[in-house]
Regions:
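Helical scaffold of the NTase/Pol beta-like nucleotidyltransferase catalytic core
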Residues: 1-40
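Short, charged/polar micro-motifs that form catalytic or ligand-binding hotspots
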Residues: 8-15, 69-73, 77
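Active-site nucleotide-donor binding segment shared across nucleotidyl transfer reactions
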Residues: 27-59, 63-73
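Conserved catalytic core of two-metal-ion nucleotidyltransferases
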Residues: 29-33, 77-132
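Predominantly extracellular/lumenal beta-strand repeat domains
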Residues: 48, 66, 78-81, 90, ...
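Glycine-rich loops and low-complexity Gly/Arg-rich segments
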Residues: 61-66, 86-89, 147-153
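Short C-terminal domain-edge/linker segments immediately following a structured domain
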Residues: 68-74, 92-95, 152-161
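Right-hand nucleic-acid polymerase module
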Residues: 102-105, 115-182
Length: 182
């Protein structure tokens, strides 16, 4: 099978559904003293979504924690579980399955017609910013041996501060395609 582009007319509904679920998730988190905002990233943000033939495709989102009570900052497992539970609660009336905890994100699947086949999924990475302005991604090291199993850590995304401003400057100079080709 060859990869094909998913047309905007098809992906628009899923983007809308995901935005609705993530808006509800942020409202639930706010009631638990976690202020967060989400953004579509990756191929979905660029309208370049692909899939293998008629197979499923996914969208990727970042959920940036702007402010949270100290208990969440000290207990990253609690933070990820709270986000996962809020996501599950927000999607209860939809067709999505409960979010699954993977290493660097929460994954939610969509099934149709009581079929085991996955039609669509979306991934939510949990991030925050450090003092340098770089993003930090919440990682669940399920098999980390050095500090025991089930370690939760923040992993810095290098040179991630002011990413939008950097991209805008490259585009303004007419060098965007050259940067993409590298």
């Amino acid at each position: 099978m060859a990869y094909e582009i998913v047309y905007e007319s098809e992906s628009k509904r899923y983007r809308s559904d995901c935005a609705s679920v993530l808006t509800k998730t942020c409202e639930i988190l706010k009631s638990k003293n976690i202020i967060a905002q989400f953004s579509l990233v990756g191929s979905g943000a660029k309208n370049l979504i692909t899939r293998n033939g008629n197979g499923p495709y996914d969208l990727d989102y970042n959920l940036v924690v702007i402010k949270a009570d100290e208990r969440y900052r000290k207990d990253l497992r609690l933070l990820k579980d709270t986000v996962r539970n809020a996501l599950n609660k927000a999607e209860r009336k939809d067709f999505f399955s409960d979010a699954m905890d993977s290493r660097s994100c929460l994954t939610t699947l969509l099934h149709f017609n009581d079929s085991p086949n996955v039609e669509f999924s979306f991934d939510v990475a949990i991030l925050t910013k450090n003092r340098n302005g770089n993003y930090m991604r919440l990682i669940h090291n399920k098999n980390a041996f050095c500090f025991g199993y089930d370690q939760y850590t923040w992993n810095e995304v290098p040179k991630s501060h002011d990413v939008k401003e950097k991209a805008d400057a490259i585009k303004a100079e007419g060098l965007w395609q050259e940067a993409r080709d590298r």
